[in-house]
């Protein structure tokens, strides 16, 4: 089965608390092979990304309503689309699930005026680097990004400008 058979569902259509609990319960599956330890993975799933900021998050569901992947993200006040986390179940990796989730996020973000999308990865995270390159994101080393000695790589992709809103014709 391909990623095209999946249904992307925005968090706003789901029970935020139940979804967060479900994804956290399966985090060892979704994050298998990640360079992040379990505490770091759990910390990515702050409740605010499900409750208050869930409008940009999405889960990819199989025809059997199983979770295949998900994305947590937000657009900041200065119009930067920030990917907090993207994870794909190992059974679905390599099928375009992350690409579909990220493209959905980018389209939503551009629609509200975001100029760029950004994610942060650990140096040497080959999976994140490959996905970023596939999507046209540029990597930039960020020494001390997460504190002294906690270097990261910032992955940035420019987003297309949303078409300007045309004012209504006052004669109509």
Label every PLM stretch briefly:
Residues 1-21, 160-172:
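Conserved N-terminal entry element of GNAT/NAT acetyltransferase domains
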Residues 10-84, 89, 102-104, 145:
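Acetyl-CoA-dependent GNAT
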Residues 55, 150-156:
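Short hydrophobic/aromatic beta-strand or adjacent loop that forms the aromatic wall/cage
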Residues 73, 158-160:
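Residue-level recognition of strand-loop junctions within catalytic nucleotide-signaling folds
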Residues 86-93, 121-123:
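A short, internal acetyl-CoA/4′-phosphopantetheine-binding micro-motif in the GNAT/acyltransferase core
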Residues 99, 123-141, 147-150:
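Conserved active-site alpha-helix within GNAT-family acetyltransferase domains
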Residues 109-121:
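Conserved GNAT acetyl-CoA-binding A-motif
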């Amino acid at each position: 089965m391909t990623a095209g058979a999946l249904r992307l569902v925005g968090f706003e259509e789901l029970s935020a608390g139940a979804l967060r609990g479900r994804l956290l319960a399966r985090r060892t599956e979704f994050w298998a092979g990640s360079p992040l330890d379990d505490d770091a993975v759990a910390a990515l799933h702050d409740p605010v990304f499900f409750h208050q900021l869930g409008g940009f998050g999405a889960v990819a569901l199989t025809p059997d309503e199983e979770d295949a992947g998900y994305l947590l993200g937000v657009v900041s006040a200065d119009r930067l689309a920030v990917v907090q986390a993207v994870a794909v179940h190992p059974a679905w990796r390599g099928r375009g699930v992350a690409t579909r989730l990220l493209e959905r996020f980018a389209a939503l973000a551009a629609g509200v005026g975001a100029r760029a999308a950004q994610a942060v990865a650990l140096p040497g995270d080959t999976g994140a680097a490959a996905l970023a390159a596939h999507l046209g994101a540029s990597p930039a080393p960020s020494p001390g990004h997460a504190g002294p000695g906690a270097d990261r790589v910032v992955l940035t992709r420019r987003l297309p400008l949303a078409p300007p809103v045309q004012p209504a014709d006052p004669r109509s």
